[in-house]
Amino acid sequence: GDRLYITAGVTAPTDSRHYPYCASWLDVEGRWTDLERPTKEGGWLSKHVTVFRDATSVVEDIFDSSHLFVTSGSHGVFEYRDGRLVNQYTQGNSCIESCSGSKSHDFVRTDAGIMDKDGSLFVANNSVDTVIWCRKPDGVWIPFFHEPVSKAGFFEKVIIDSKGRLWFANRRTDGNVSGGVLCIDYGQTVDNATDDVYTFRH
């Protein structure tokens, strides 16, 4: 598109660093626009979350540039329409999970968002059993479970190549999962797991 999107968050190995939630875009005329920030006052899980932080990636809907998704390193995925926050996908209202033993809403780690040609949104849900999830345009969530990367904590970057394959980069070794690159060839059929081919190189 004709926008440059940025986020100002990070997933720190020891939770030693965090940044206020910030997601913005730069248009062709050089103007910056900030997306609405989630607040307690706005009703976004105010009973559970203390401070919203760490926006990590922005995904523009390929069919509607006013429709965006923002992943965050602490609070799941946020959905926007016309710059306004309309939804949050997190522990309890979606398949995305918290990585903490107490299932705290402050540890719902998501990153590496991307959308395929059919409008299906892929995100990494780090440090849990099923790390890669797909949200179809109809709102149904589909798991992409691969045992060798289960509980990987640092899937932060992703691309889709010319053959429609997903390439996720795990930045560093974390527990039993090495840093490396995961390729998912799902045959561009998110509902059919029988043709999925996973390759993890580290």
Regions inferred by a protein language model and the residue ranges of each:
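Carboxylate-rich, polar loop motifs that coordinate divalent cations or form catalytic acidic clusters
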Residues: 1-202
